């Protein structure tokens, strides 16, 4: 998977010795042939953009009200994710994209070695051209939440065209992330 862009999405992250620039350097070391694109918010000026890297600054759309069962907060950053990922994907022309949060990194490139064709699936229900790899970290248990089709925002790896299908929302209002049963 040489035709790869790593899309780093979100605000600048900093905690003790960890920060987004450190994470980006680790990603560059482990994915040396990948392009780097950062999609963040206006006034996020701590990112160190190197030669051949690209950064786009988005208007921050703010949070939306989050009343779903199991939520510990009253605001969801889903709209922020959609805006930064969608705008980032629109700038990418490589075949594959690894979308990752700005507070995350991979210690190796083993994810690129997964043999996805070994897994069976029913072609009648196929939505994507290839499989998309994502994490279970941050994915909600459907038995304890009222958000349908939730998946982790930590990372997505797949065809850029397939990721565009996932992140194609135009806007999200406060209660559109919730559903209710009668």
Residue map of PLM features:
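A short acidic (Asp/Glu
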Residues: 17-20, 47-50, 92, 108-113, ...
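N-proximal low-complexity "stem/linker" segments adjacent to membrane-targeting elements
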Residues: 1-18
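Short acidic donor-binding/metal-coordinating loop in glycosyltransferase active sites
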Residues: 100-104
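Active-site-proximal specificity loops/subdomain of glycosyltransferases
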Residues: 39-91
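Short, well-formed alpha-helical segments that are part of the catalytic scaffolds
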Residues: 14-30
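Short loop->beta transition adjacent to catalytic acidic/histidine clusters or analogous donor-positioning motifs
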Residues: 2-4, 28-38, 53
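Short aromatic/hydrophobic "clamp" motif used to bind/position activated sugar donors
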Residues: 97
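Catalytic core and acceptor-binding pocket of nucleotide-sugar-dependent glycosyltransferases
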Residues: 106-182
């Amino acid at each position: 998977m040489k035709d790869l862009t790593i899309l780093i999405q979100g605000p600048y992250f900093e905690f003790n010795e960890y920060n987004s620039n450190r994470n980006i350097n680790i990603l560059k070391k482990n994915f040396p042939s990948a392009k780097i694109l950062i999609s963040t918010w206006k006034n996020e000026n701590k990112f160190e953009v190197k030669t051949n890297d690209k950064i786009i600054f988005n208007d921050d759309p703010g949070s939306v009200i989050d009343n779903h069962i199991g939520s510990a907060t009253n605001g969801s950053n889903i709209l922020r994710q959609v805006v930064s990922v969608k705008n980032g994907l629109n700038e990418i022309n490589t075949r594959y994209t690894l979308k990752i949060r700005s507070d995350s990194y991979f210690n190796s490139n083993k994810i690129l070695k997964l043999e996805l064709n070994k897994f069976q699936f029913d072609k009648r229900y196929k939505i994507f051209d290839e499989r998309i790899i994502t994490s279970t970290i941050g994915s909600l248990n459907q038995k304890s939440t009222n958000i349908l089709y939730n998946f982790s925002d930590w990372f997505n790896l797949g065809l850029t065209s397939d990721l565009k299908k996932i992140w194609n929302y135009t806007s999200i209002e406060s209660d559109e992330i919730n559903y209710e049963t009668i």
